[in-house]
A protein has these predicted regions:
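Nucleotidyltransferase catalytic core that binds NTPs
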Residues: 1-182
Length: 182
């Protein structure tokens, strides 16, 4: 077990696959830094790459704060003490800024489902970060995806069963599913 670990993701519809990833990473470290990417969807860096789905506005309906709250409440609900993790912005689109948010002596825990996952591992290693791939799976092996969660919200389907209870509660209390349906 390492002292400090880190993970990163968009978490645009925190789902059970994200929780599997977060909880496995937490098992491997005493303190976990959770980096949230695309924290400023209006950033010029994001706009320059808007042709990629992960940078399009409709793929990013939840604000940084909303995602921070969903993650925090879901991690605590899962039994992780609040003092054992933190959540920070994570500028994957501007890698040279990452050290402003995550110290260089952490171990990044990654999962790989596609080339984008491999690219992130490679980018972090080039920057001098130690990485550990927790698993590599095919896209078909995903528990679910944020895309699927958002699609079910838009269609009035059963998105709730794909998300942690605390995240569902937060979404419903703040009527966030309406943001996805716009």
């Amino acid at each position: 077990m390492v002292a400090i670990g880190a993970v990163q993701g968009r978490f645009q519809g925190l789902h059970m696959g994200h929780m599997e990833f977060l909880l496995e990473a937490k098992k491997r470290c005493q303190f976990l830094i959770i980096g949230v990417t695309n924290y400023d969807i209006h950033s010029q860096y994001i706009k320059n790459d808007a042709k990629l789905n992960r940078f399009q506005e409709q793929a990013n309906p939840f604000t940084y704060f909303e995602r921070l709250m969903m993650i925090t409440e879901s991690m605590v609900e899962a039994g992780v003490p609040r003092e054992e993790f933190t959540i920070v912005p994570f500028p994957i689109e501007v890698p040279e800024k990452i050290p402003n948010f995550v110290p260089e002596d952490v171990v990044f825990f990654q999962t790989i489902y596609d080339q984008w996952g491999r690219n992130k591992v490679e980018q972090l290693q080039k920057m001098g970060y130690q990485t550990e791939v927790m698993w590599e799976r095919t896209d078909a092996d995903r528990l679910t995806s944020g895309t699927q969660v958002r699609k079910l919200m838009q269609e009035g389907g059963d998105w709730e069963s794909l998300m942690p209870k605390a995240a569902v509660k937060y979404v419903k209390e703040h009527h966030l599913e309406k943001k996805v349906c716009r």
